[in-house]
């Protein structure tokens, strides 16, 4: 670029005319984009790990993840046919069949859903771009590793412009942000999850406790010492093991304990809390093997439809709609899950293996 007269006399060039300086990362730097793909730095949040330890929550998550992970993605345009907008399916971009070069779509989409389900948001980092500037490959960023400085949550109002990964700032233009229409379950009902965890802990303690089947009570005579009572109980147990009939004198009475296994394991409380967790996870309770009283006939196809409509669809639409945004695909190009194959029954592994009666059923 030709210098002006002032620049020639001063012997220097104005900074505005100089190309921007690109600062190289210091040797051994870490965090931010430098940590993407370094899986030894990845982790899941403790609140998520606590919630997944609840059996109903785990079952709900696995049911929905199995649907999200096993459905194919397809790409289409829309065209006006004179009456309505018609979908015209097109050849997909290469990344649609393998979103991340390092893992399968089944794995990545299932764990992308996992972040949406538990936290209400999920992230993919753009690791390469095609010649037209659009993303060509991605890598998942675990939600627990990402910090949103401008929107700490738990409710997110839009994409964040201040994302930090492993302590360093990320260029938000290289991050695809999935925002769930449903708040993450670890934020929705913390007390319900805490109650379920305490209930499981109580059941575990009771399962480890030895409660006698009965009590020998002295009703008369000279009071017996602790040693004598222990010897009498041991002799009584030995006699019961070797004889069908036990004998007691008029000064000793045998009284059965009223504690039963269902009371010890808090079965009624467990059933109620399982129902609460099914409500929290937004799936019909019968899909998690929970008894719901009166029933009407439910076929396997109707069960798949219930799982899709009440549980999976909101998350599937969130993922597909985010992939259809203009920072991922050109305007007018869209992505959707092939839900028809699932609803028509070509994907039946998960539902056919469910442990439920043949006349299983939804609440009437």
Which residues fall in each region the model found?
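Long, compositionally biased
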Residues: 304-340
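Structured, contiguous alpha/beta core segments that scaffold functional sites
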Residues: 2-266, 270-272, 276, 348-364
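Short proline/glycine- and acidic-rich turn/helix-capping motifs at secondary-structure junctions
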Residues: 250-255, 295, 340-345
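Short acidic alpha-helical/loop segments enriched in Asp/Glu that coordinate divalent cations
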Residues: 245-247, 285-296, 325-329
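Short Asp/Glu-rich motifs
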Residues: 115, 296-297
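Internal mixed-charge
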Residues: 264, 273-282, 316-319
